[in-house]
Amino acid sequence: MKSGFAAILGRPSTGKSTLLNSICGHKISIISPIPQTTRNNIKGIFTDDRGQIIFIDTPGFHLSKKKFNIAMMKNIHSSIGEVELILYIIDIQDKPGEEENKMLEIIKNSKIKFLVILNKIDLKNTKIKEITQFLKEKGIEDSNIIKISAEKKINTEELKNKIYENFSEGPLYYPQEYYTDQEINFRISEIIREKAIENLKEELPYSLYVDIDTLENKKGSLFIRANIFVANESQKGIIVGKNGKEIKSIGERARKTIAKIFETKCNLFLQVKLKKNWNKEDKLIKRLIN
C-alpha cells in the first residue's frame, strides 16, 4: 500500500480546487473564476485499494507585495516542505509568464518530485503549443507532464496512477471514510464566503471574511449564525444589496449547499458587519490564512 502528500500549486484560477474536488469526489475547496479565492492550504483525501493520497490545495501563486498576498505565498512555501510530490497546474488558455518562471524555479530548487499538469484540454483556442515549447526550453521531460481536464474528469485516473508511481509504501494517515480534515466551522464559513463572492464585484474577495458566531445541532438540523465582515462601508452596501436582495440570495444559496454537503436541514442567519481595513491587520490575516 502506498501513501503520501501532494501539494497542488499554480496560478490563480487554473483549476486547482476543481481538481481537488473532482478527484476526492466531494466539495472540499470553494471554486470561483475570481483569482485567489482559496486562501488557506486545504487538505483533500483520496483513498482506494492502492493506498491514500493527501492533497494540499494551495492559494494561487501571484507576485504581489500586498500583506494578504505575502501571507498566502508563505502558505505555498510551507506546503512544499511537507510533501512527497508537487502537482503544478497550468491553465492552457494562458501564455507562460513571469509566474511560470518563478514557480518552476521554486519547484526545481525544492528537489521534490513533481508533475506538470496541463489543465482544460477540453477547451478550444488554447496556448498548448507555446506552453509545451516553454516547458521543453525549461528542461521539463515529457514523463513529468500530463494533460487533463479537471472539470470533465479527462485523464484524472491516469493522473492518480502517476501520483501513486511517485509515492513509497506507507500507512493510511486518515481513516478510509475521510475526504478532508477540515473542521465543520471552517467548511461552513468557506461555503458562505464562496456564495458572497459569486456575482459580486471583483475586489470583494480580498475584502471580506466570514466568522461563525453560532453553530449548533438542534433536533437534527444545523442552526448557524454567521457574520460577513468587510473592510469599508461601500462593500457592506454591495453585499446587502437593494432592500437586502443580495444578502438574502447569499443566504439561500449557502443554505442549500450546506444542507446538501452535510445531508441535514439548515437554518442560516447572516449579518454583514464593518471592520475597517481588517485586511491590513497582521494578527487577523495570520489567523485567517493559517
Swiss-Prot record:
Residues covered by region (G4): 119-122
Its membrane topology: Peripheral membrane protein
Ranges for domain KH type-2: 200-276
Localization per record: Cytoplasm; Cell inner membrane
Domain Era-type G: 2-169
GO biological process, one term: ribosomal small subunit assembly
GO molecular function list: GTP binding; GTPase activity; ribosomal small subunit binding; small ribosomal subunit rRNA binding
Binding site for GTP: 10-17, 57-61, 119-122
Keywords, in A-Z order: Cell inner membrane, Cell membrane, Cytoplasm, GTP-binding, Membrane, Nucleotide-binding, Ribosome biogenesis, RNA-binding, rRNA-binding
Region described as G3: 57-60
Record region (G2): 36-40
Region (G5): 148-150
Domain of life: Bacteria
G1, as annotated region: 10-17
Gene Ontology cellular component list: cytosol; plasma membrane
Gene3D superfamilies: 3.30.300.20, P-loop containing nucleotide triphosphate hydrolases
Xref: InterPro entries: G_ERA_dom, GTP-bd, GTPase_Era-like, KH_dom-like_a/b, KH_dom_type_2, KH_sf_prok-type, P-loop_NTPase, Small_GTP-bd
SS bond list: none
Family under the similarity heading: Belongs to the TRAFAC class TrmE-Era-EngA-EngB-Septin-like GTPase superfamily. Era GTPase family.
Subunit-level organization: Monomer.
Function, in words: An essential GTPase that binds both GDP and GTP, with rapid nucleotide exchange. Plays a role in 16S rRNA processing and 30S ribosomal subunit biogenesis and possibly also in cell cycle regulation and energy metabolism.
Entry protein name: GTPase Era
Natural source organism: Borreliella burgdorferi (strain ATCC 35210 / DSM 4680 / CIP 102532 / B31)
